[in-house]
């Protein structure tokens, strides 16, 4: 499969939402480069088998499987700094005043926060 997506709409979404700016080339990543960044920064950290890595990369390039697109978007320096940005949602009980600063931090990372204000938790405040 080429480094490009089959339709203009897919290309627009991938470029506008997931492709990183490449300073040296003065352009955004193409689909193949975006997938490679994801493979190198996320998948290769847990999978060491080159054959499996290549198979996963080809499956993503061929649109046979899709990873978490938030992980695709943040793979690299952002996720290395704090992997909270790779999650779509999180949850915490409001049982300590620190719950509020944790919720704010998680939200600032771009992750949604669900919370519980059940009696057994809020009585601990």
Label each PLM-derived region with a short phrase.
Residues 1-125:
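Extended catalytic cores of very large enzyme megasubunits
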């Amino acid at each position: 499969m080429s480094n490009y997506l089959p339709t203009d709409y897919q290309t627009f979404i991938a470029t506008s939402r997931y492709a990183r700016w490449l300073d040296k080339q003065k352009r955004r990543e193409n689909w193949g480069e975006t997938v490679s960044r994801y493979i190198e920064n996320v998948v290769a950290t847990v999978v060491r088998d080159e054959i499996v890595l290549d198979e996963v990369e080809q499956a993503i390039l061929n649109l046979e499987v899709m990873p978490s697109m938030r992980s695709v978007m943040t793979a690299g320096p952002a996720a290395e700094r704090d992997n909270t940005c790779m999650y779509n949602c999180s949850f915490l009980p409001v049982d300590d005043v620190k719950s509020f600063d944790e919720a704010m931090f998680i939200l600032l990372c771009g992750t949604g926060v669900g919370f519980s204000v059940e009696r057994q938790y809020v009585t601990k405040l």
